[in-house]
Amino acid sequence: MAATLRELRGRIRSAGSIKKITKAQELIATSRIGRAQARLDSARPYAFQITAMLTTLAAEAALDHPLLVERPEPKRAGVLVVSSDRGLCGAYNASIFRRAEELFSLLREQGKTPVLYSVGRKALNYYTFRNWDISGSWTGFSEQPQYENAAEIAETLVESFMRGTGGEDEGESDAESVDELHIVYTEFKSMLSQSAVAHRIAPMVVEYVEEPPEVRTLYSFEPDATTLFESLLPRYLTTRVYAALLESAASELASRQRAMKSATDNADDLIKALTLMANRERQAQITQEISEIVGGANALADAR
C-alpha cells in the first residue's frame, strides 16, 4: 500500500512537471501567433497584387516565357514541402506529409517523377528516414521566416526549372532539372482552422478575365512588356514562396498553441484523478493503521 501511494505521488509530480512544460509552450505560441498573423496579413495583399499584375501582363502582352509555357511531355516535377523545425504541434506535420503523398501519387499517375525539396527539420528527417533523394533542404526558420530565406529557396527552384528540358530523353536531361514546380504548405484560415494545400507555381497559370466593353482597361507598358515581366517575375516567385512560409509559420504556431493547451488540460485532469486516488489510498492506509492500533489495544486489554 505504501509503495502504491509513493508511485501515485511520483506520477503526480511527473504530471506536474509535464504540465509546466506544456503551459510554457502554450504561452510562447500564444505570444508569437499575433506577430505571425500580422506579418501574414501584411504579405497577403502584396502577393495577391503581384500575381494579378503578372497574370494581366502575360495575358495582355501574349508573352512567351519559359515560366508561362506548358512543356511538352513534362517528366520531372519539383515539389517543395514546408514543415516545421520543432514538434509539439499536433497533427500539423502529419497533415503536410499526407497531402504531399497525395501529390506524389498524382504526379506519378501523370508519368512525372517527383523531385523533392524540403523546408523544416521534420520534413528533412521524415524523408531521409524513408530514403528519399532530397534535392534541396532548408532548416532553422520555420517559425519566423524572412524574405531572404524565401529568396534563397526561390532562386534554387527557378534554377532547376530553367534547366528543365521538357520532352527530351530522360538520359539527356539534367539530373537537377524539373519541368514543373509545386509547393505543399499549410494554409492559415483562423486560429481554429488550417489546412494542408498544394499549388503549382510554375509554369504560371494565366487566367484571362473578360471585362465588359464599357470598362475595358487599356495597358501601357514602360519600357516594354517583356522587360517589365522579366523584372517582376523573380519577385513573384519569391513572394509566392514567402507567402507560403508565412502561412505555414502562423499555422504551426496555432497548431502548437492548441496542442499544448489540450496537453495542459489533460495534465490537469490527470493530476486531479491521481490526487483523488492518492487521497483514497492514504485514507485506506490511515484506516488500516487505526484498526491495527485498536486491535492491539483490545488484545492488551484482553491479556489483562
UniProtKB/Swiss-Prot annotation:
Pfam families: ATP-synt. One of its GO terms (biological process) is proton motive force-driven plasma membrane ATP synthesis. One of its GO terms (molecular function) is proton-transporting ATP synthase activity, rotational mechanism. Keywords: ATP synthesis, Cell membrane, CF(1), Hydrogen ion transport, Ion transport, Membrane, Transport. It is a peripheral membrane protein. Its main location: membrane. It is found in: Cell membrane. It comes from the Bacteria. InterPro entries: ATP_synth_F1_ATPase_gsu, ATP_synth_F1_gsu, ATP_synth_F1_gsu_CS. PANTHER family: ATP SYNTHASE GAMMA CHAIN, ATP SYNTHASE SUBUNIT GAMMA, MITOCHONDRIAL. Belongs to the ATPase gamma chain family. F-type ATPases have 2 components, CF(1) - the catalytic core - and CF(0) - the membrane proton channel. CF(1) has five subunits: alpha(3), beta(3), gamma(1), delta(1), epsilon(1). CF(0) has three main subunits: a, b and c. HAMAP family: ATP_synth_gamma_bact (MF_00815). This is ATP synthase gamma chain. The lineage of its organism: Bacteria, Bacillati, Actinomycetota, Actinomycetes, Mycobacteriales. The gene is atpG.
